[in-house]
Amino acid sequence: MQQQYNPSAIEPKVQQFWAENKVFKAVKDVTKEKYYCLSMLPYPSGKLHMGHVRNYTIGDVVSRYQRMIGKNVLQPMGWDAFGLPAEGAAVKNNTAPAKWTYENIEYMKGQLKMLGFSYDWDREVTTCRPEYYKWEQWFFTELYKKGLVYKKTSTVNWCPNDATVLANEQVHEGCCWRCDTPVEQREIPQWFIKITDYAEELLTHLDNLPQWPDQVKTMQRNWIGRSEGVEITFKIAGSNAELPVYTTRPDTFFGVSYVAIAAAHPLAEMAAENNPALAEFIREAKNTKVAEAELATMEKKGMATGLFAIHPLTGKEVPVWVANFVLMHYGTGAVMAVPAHDERDFEFAQKYGLQINQVIQPLDGSEWDFSKAAYTEHGKLINSAEFDDLNFEQAFNAIADKLESMKVGKRQVNFRLRDWGVSRQRYWGAPIPMMTTEDGEVVTVPMQDLPVILPEDVVMNGVQSPIKADPEWAKTTYNGKPALKETDTFDTFMESSWYYARYTCPQYHEGMLDSDEANYWLPVDQYIGGIEHATMHLLYFRFFHKLLRDAGILNSDEPATKLLCQGMVLADAFYYTSPTNERIWVSPTQVTLERDEKGRIIKATDPEGRELVHSGMTKMSKSKNNGIDPQEMVEKYGADTVRLFMMFASPAEMTLEWQESGVEGAKRFLGRVWNLVYEYSQNPATAALDVAALSKAQKELRRDVHKTIAKVSDDIGRRQTFNTAIAAIMELMNKLTKAPLENEQDKAVMAEALSAVVRMLYPITPHICFELWQALGNNDTIDFAPWVVADESAMVEDEKLVVVQVNGKVRGKVTVSATATEDEVKAIAKADANVAKFLEGVEIVKEIYVPYKMLSFAVKA
């Protein structure tokens, strides 16, 4: 063992040993309890960032710990390799997306290996490889045959200049990112998977996931958005047309003063035929793409159609308006508006001078000022004919009953969740395995013709997908007759919805999954990834698992038992303002800092001497140029130090502030561990530990060791508070550094302690522990060493400290035997000099004893 800790000399050597010996290869073994630990797979963007490092370090700590406690651990890694960024990079670098992607994968794989993660690389999955997406295509054709896939028109962003579809992120302030042409909304046919068929189960099964964060479950519940209400049909005056609306508040039905419909509603189109102003308003509204999140805050705009709807219960006519806050793909594309009791309807009514009819009164009978706001709470009905005085529940049922009896309404459960649109008009994705025959019949690509391979040697022009631009690519035959292949590709969420299952059998070629392998390893025991995936990936991932179950491939209901959402990584951000008033962000690695006595930044300058503005700690990002390159940090400090800092600086689910001073502190701590093992290894124990022969000080030190083992085991295994586990090891190290090594039992206690420290640190800092384990004289590698177990008998204290109070004030502390009786404790306390002087010449009127904790005397003169 070298005297000095030098990570760059150790880490590559240890990593080579792991690779050559396939130490982390996972093999099904029904005699052992399995443990499947998975971090969300990365997009191969070119370089790892600190967010990746944090996610994967957490996963690796969990995996190594579970392996040490005797479980059969699977920890795989792969690449979510399709996606839009590759197309942009290919155009920019004049290369093909595939070439760019594969080069990035190789580079990033090297970075992952450099960090020492214990992956089974034989299970690596790359989602853009035909052997992977072949089975995704096959499964899609199976879903189509089951009636779970359909095609319908849907709105997309269309650039008329480039004649191409744009992804949302390619639309900048309503214009095309490439040519600045105003973007239009266009209806085109797209493929959908019926996730709505599973809405109820996706919702109710959230209750079966006690080890998922409540925040994620709440976000999914809201996204699925189950509501109970009534669908009501209004007739249109002077025509046979009908207008269905859905409401969750039938109690407000008598307050309807207008009906609002979406710009794309058939009635709106009909009304616009002879109304050029309305036609123009509709065109403008259709071309303003609105994210649902913006609906509440955006300016409400509308126009009267000239049509009137007949209220089914009062017979009164109410105007029909086109409004920009109603979306065609939500519910029926129409809403009954009750301005008195809905904030959005109220804003719109105030703007356009529409009637506001109060029909709900606060339960306490108080007056409400309708000039200021709508009253949106439940209450008591007024101005509602025979339904007056009913509360919400009574009115809901009574009005629903009446509408149903009149055949103009029906109770209905609705979901906010929409079917999953999986068509993308991009090139770099898996081709959708459908084709159209010359007589217009839409059919699936037969199994023997799968995969439909995406050509990889293409030239990107930055405008159109190469498979759309090449008329030859789509040409095929079906039953000997000409047909055309679909040129759209899958949404990349398709690949990431089932990769976790493919890891269980990546070399299996007889089908999508080997059910024996998949059902042995699944569900995932621990899944780790960011909370930003709560309503997209994590919902599709659950949905796909249920589809695979219903296809008879899997036998579990949910894909992952436990979910941990790691916090973001933040770093200081600095900028100066250019002469053109633009913020120029300077990397923290280029900044010279001055701090005050409390460590706060008081001055920051760049290499040119410019004074910079410190904008605080923000998420590491390219836009603020405050990302820290993990590779630079590993080269400077070592992988173990980076890993230790990542796990220690903050609880796993909270944000982590990157501080290089903290990284330096982590390196110093590992240096102290190294030095202590080195010092011990120069003069190791020759006698075995003899518990009976230990001195009081030796017993105390040994007690601290075993208490730390118990705490660290609980913190890593059950609580997942990795930072407190590390803090406990650091505290123990402080005691060990001060412990004497004067006799054989000193050394024997130290040998046991160091063996424990090295094993407890191993999941977090595996390279240094690999070396230290050998230095402690162990023949086998630490990779196969069992986790250290606390000795209960060592934690039993021989002595207890009892606090002694006289008339409520602490007057002394006495040490007593852990087996002392109450009378013995009282005698020792009364004999203590500090206590005795307060008991002299007084009468003890009461004694209260809390065993081995406190003794209290009440006295009077």
Swiss-Prot record:
Pfam families: Anticodon_1, tRNA-synt_1, tRNA-synt_1_2, tRNA-synt_1g. InterPro entries: aa-tRNA-synth_I_CS, aa-tRNA-synth_Ia, Leu-tRNA-ligase, Leu_tRNA-synth_edit, M/V/L/I-tRNA-synth_anticd-bd, Methionyl/Leucyl_tRNA_Synth, Rossmann-like_a/b/a_fold, tRNAsynth_Ia_anticodon-bd. A motif ('HIGH' region) lies at residues 42-52. Its EC number is 6.1.1.4. CDD domains: Anticodon_Ia_Leu_BEm, LeuRS_core. It is found in: Cytoplasm. A motif ('KMSKS' region) lies at residues 619-623. Gene3D superfamilies: 2.20.28.290, 3.10.20.590, HUPs, Isoleucyl-tRNA Synthetase, Domain 1. GO terms for cellular component: cytosol. It comes from the Bacteria. Belongs to the class-I aminoacyl-tRNA synthetase family. NCBIfam families: leuS_bact. This is Leucine--tRNA ligase.
